[in-house]
Amino acid sequence: LKKSLKHFSAKKLSKKAAASSLALALFSGLVPVQVDTTIAAAATGTKATAALAKLAIKGRAPKTGYDRDLFSDGWGDIGECDARNYILRRDLKSITWRDSPRCTVATGILNDPYTARKIYFVRGVSTSMAVQIDHIVAVSDAWQKGAQQLSYSKRYAFYNDPLNLLAVDGPANMQKSDSDAASWLPPNKGYRCSYVARQIAVKAKYKLWVTKAERDAMARVLKTCPNQLIPRG
C-alpha cells in the first residue's frame, strides 16, 4: 500500500510540475482568442520536406501497455483554463462565454480545416461533440512510435500541447481515429499540406518516428507544396 501511495503521489506531483511548465511556456506568448486554424501556429523557416527527411523511419511498435492516462488523466490546465477550452477559445470565432474568467466557451463558429465546413458550436450534452479537439498526431500512434520511451512529463506535454491540438468537425475526427498520414488525410485537400507539416513538427519536437508508409504518404502530399514550412511550437 505504501508503495502504491508513493507511486500515486509521484505521478500527481509530476503532473503538477508538467502542467506548471506547460502553462509558463504557453503564456509567455498567449495565443489570441480568435485565430484562423490554418495559421494558428506561426511558421518557422524550416521546410516540411527537410524536417521530414530528419525523422527516423521504423516499424510500428506493439500497442502493449497503452493507456491514455499514461499521457494525461483528462485535459491538463493551461493557466486558468483546461486545454480543451483553451483550444476552443483559440480556434472558434464569434464566441460567447458561460463563465468568468473566460474559459468555458458557450457558443462559437468553427471554420473547420478538415472539411472546409462552417460549424456552429453550441455547448450541451447532445451538441458539444459537433466540434471535437483532435490530437493531430494521435495519442496511440505516438505511443507506438516512440512515446513509450518518453517520461511522464514529456507525454503530458505532448497530450496538452496546442501545437498538436486542433478544433475540428466531430465526425471527421472520429473517422480519423488513431490513423497516421498513411491511412487518413483530411477530406479538405486544401488543408493537407498544413496538416502534414504540423504532424511532422510534432513528431520532430517529441522525437517520434514515422513508418515508411507514413513517410511516403507525407512526401506525396508535400510534392504539391514544396515550400510548405513547419509551424513553430
What residues fall within each predicted segment?
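N-terminal module-boundary/linker segments of secreted carbohydrate-active enzymes
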Residues: 27, 38-81, 85, 212-214, ...
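Secreted/periplasmic proteins that engage bacterial cell-wall peptidoglycan
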Residues: 60-132, 136-137
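Short, solvent-exposed coil/turn linker segments
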Residues: 4, 65-67, 91, 138, ...
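Secretory targeting and sorting signals
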Residues: 2-38
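Domain-level detector of nuclease and nuclease-like folds
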Residues: 105, 114-233
